[in-house]
Amino acid sequence: MQFRLDLRIGGAEGALLRVLGMIERRGFTASSVQAQRQADGSWQLQMTVDGQRPGHTLAMQLGKVYDCLAVEVSAVAGEAA
């Protein structure tokens, strides 16, 4: 299954690495990543990930990561989230 993640993470040192590490540890593979630094120092990320687990489960886990300010998940190309 393929999912799109829209994330906003704070600018703390290691925040991006923590998010990417959580995605991989939970059995998902990032197939595309777009990141843009915001004026307030936070990051706006748009990612496409592949995995067999439900996307909402990953969203809940990412929401617990330190400095993850917002997360939304949606299915890609008719896949169920």
Where are these regions (language model features)?
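A conserved regulatory-domain signal marking ACT and ACT-like small-molecule sensing domains
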Residues: 1-81
